[in-house]
């Protein structure tokens, strides 16, 4: 197999196999994600509306590595749409000091991007947010192909 005109052997020799495969599969992953979002649009909107129809709220996008990049990318489009109440933080910033990023009292929608949903970063985000936030809603985008919503 060849990716980016590099043979599998050449990629192994430069320790680039994982990265090359990760980049190569992104277009297909995003197509699947868009299709899934379209299929459950009404359900997702109803869940999100529980938060955004309140007088004040925060939407916090978070993830690590490429998952953080997803949140940062969506931030540009979502922040103006939601009256500049959207934030995007790296899990590595949020987990050790959630009180510096999360409101104790505002309704907060935590959108957690991750590959498996079981990484230390993903689990840490949830645990940290649950300690700080009294009115928390979770939306998990796992592997960018599975979405789960949960209210705590």
Tell what function each PLM region has:
Residues 1-46, 50-53:
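Cofactor-/ligand-binding subdomain signature composed of acidic, glycine-rich
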Residues 53-148:
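Glycine-rich phosphate-binding loops that contact phosphosugars or nucleotide phosphates
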């Amino acid at each position: 197999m060849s990716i980016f005109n590099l043979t599998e052997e050449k990629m192994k020799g430069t320790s680039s196999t994982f990265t090359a495969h990760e980049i190569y599969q992104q277009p297909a992953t995003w197509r699947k994600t868009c299709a899934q979002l379209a299929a459950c649009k009404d359900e997702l909107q109803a869940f999100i509306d529980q938060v955004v129809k309140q007088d004040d709220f925060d939407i916090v996008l978070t993830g690590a590595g490429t998952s953080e990049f997803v949140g940062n990318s969506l931030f540009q489009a979502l922040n103006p749409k939601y009256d500049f109440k959207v934030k995007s933080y790296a899990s590595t910033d949020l987990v050790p000091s959630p009180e510096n990023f999360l409101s104790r009292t505002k309704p907060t929608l935590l959108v957690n991007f991750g590959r498996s949903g079981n990484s230390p970063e993903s689990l840490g985000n949830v645990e940290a947010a649950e300690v700080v936030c009294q009115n928390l809603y979770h939306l998990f985008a796992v592997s960018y192909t599975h979405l789960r919503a949960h209210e705590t």
